[in-house]
């Protein structure tokens, strides 16, 4: 709503003549009221109120109404109430309401709406209750507003009574009132009643159906929400941006089929709005599809839509997840040009994006330039240090967070503990955990406990990590046992590894990765019979190792490679160049690490299998399609991988960085690996 600041002298009455010398606003006619008739005065004052003026002007107009003895004028009263309510001054709106002697349905509706739109739901319902005493019959505008009060406050008992009142006056099946009833019952969790109202409505529009979709989605009835969308199609009701927004809670971590249905719905929409684009990007992000989110955002811009804060906060995490740094930088430039900061949400998203792209200094620049920071800002920067293996910097920043006057929350401690774990800071991690429990009195959650197990396990204290699990006050989850099993693989503890694996097979019987880990532990110990048994179990269960996948951005396009991928148009060139690189690596002493190959592969095939891991293909493709002198920090190659980098690829990346004199950054599920001149930033500790 556009609000106009009206010069006070426009009202031109004696008390305010000193304002007449000011420049008159060109947006409104000059109001000369001294010689006007009462009808003209009412008209001119009403014109000012229609502009929704600022509070100073509004009070001046109100004073003039009192001086002119126009308090009983219902037209001016209604406009005064609306203007006060728009400024969230509901008390003043109520005073105006109380001074109107004869109230009709319009006046009462405005008062109800003033309360409800400002969150005073109970007061709105009370005003509705006075209508019978005033002998005023509610209309089809009254009921939707008071039903909204019931929806927002969850007062289903009152909502049912209002439904009864609407039925008595014959309005319950009309469009506006019916929509309000569907929304009220749906949001209060009474979905069968919501459906019944919809079915009994004499006329239904897209809002009617969207209201039912919202009800199902908000009550975790995801399949029903999608079924209603399909039903809309069958009755020839077109989906709109509201339908998509209503569906968003229903398509979080859902099936690929459901995501494809929403995608199909989106592309079938005749006229797309920015809201619909934002929702579709959100659907992709809520279902771990960042590549698709980035591609859709680029398409949105190409179609002429200008992103808003919602678009940006949705797509920046996708840029981070895919290392789409060039797009992330472009969005940062847009934010600065449009002067969208200071804005904590955007600035925190920028820190996270730069951190995930391996641009630690850029993330730090955003952090340092923030006018104000919240705990999320500090946590994002601590995470940036931790993921880059700079545990000491993460711990130091955590100390500064405490000095800033903010209180670290549960997530800040998880992030700091993870940073200690990745950097091997055992004592610092122990101190952090003690600080959390003893000083801040934060009860450890499973995330904190998993970090402690990981911290102890990485430090080689596998037995202590196992005792820590045994002493836990809550039942360990998959993440806790997974951290222990990973430590057993690194430190060759077969006995405890078997115990951890047994627990994991009970908690996550369909997760192939844990079978592979146990198989690798047995293989490292030379227990080949057990390796065969594990592989046979996997085959009998139909389990396969999750395929490795790596993303790399080249010329602002994200390219995805799978292990052994031959689908890329440049595949033949990639494999030829890879063969050349492997020969050069062998000249420097490279020997393929057969421990990193699948143990059910024949020995002579292991080297071939290792050579086609996804990150190797992505590196070669980037080397072929970029030049060292191009922009972007000497054209660093940035790769994201869906699995932990294997030992062989780690060695290969070091050698390739040495051979090509190129910086290569690989972000796997654990941390960043920055390869420069044959050395990795992790110090071979990951």
Curated annotation (Swiss-Prot):
Residue ranges, annotated region (Type DYW motif): 587-686
UniProt KW Transmembrane helix keyword: no
GO biological process, one term: RNA modification
InterPro entries referenced in this protein's UniProt entry, alphabetically: DYW_dom (IPR032867), E_motif (IPR046848), Eplus_motif (IPR046849), Pentatricopeptide_rpt (IPR002885), PPR_At4g14850-like_plant (IPR046960), TPR-like_helical_dom_sf (IPR011990)
Pfam families: DYW_deaminase, E_motif, Eplus_motif, PPR, PPR_2
Single GO molecular function: zinc ion binding
Keywords, comma-separated and alphabetical: Repeat
Stretches for region Type E(+) motif: 556-586
PPR repeat segments: 73-103, 104-138, 139-173, 174-204, 205-239, 240-272, 273-307, 308-342, 343-373, 374-408, 409-439, 445-475
Keyword Repeat on entry: yes
Annotated region (Type E motif), positions in chain: 480-555
Family membership: Belongs to the PPR family. PCMP-H subfamily.
Name assigned to this protein: Putative pentatricopeptide repeat-containing protein At3g49142
The species this protein was found in: Arabidopsis thaliana (Mouse-ear cress)
